[in-house]
């Protein structure tokens, strides 16, 4: 099971039927929808602001999602795929999108 850690009184909330890789790290104010997959070596850092992830989202291996203190949250819409080793630092990604490295 993934490492899930409470920070500043916030505990991650994972939706129904989600896959969490054994070495994924999910910290703080993170909420996912249902049917998501969080793959190996992925880090979701909701330690200084919130991360909201829609339904059917796929966050692939090695990706890091990190918010900006008192500036920006992360919002990911439904059916988004975040490619391998992508860093998202305070952003809003609309539904049915794909992000990747070139």
Roles of regions detected by a PLM:
Residues 1-95:
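Domain-scale signature associated with acetyltransferase and cell-envelope carbohydrate enzymes
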Residues 98-102:
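Conserved small/polar residues in nucleotide/adenosyl-binding loops
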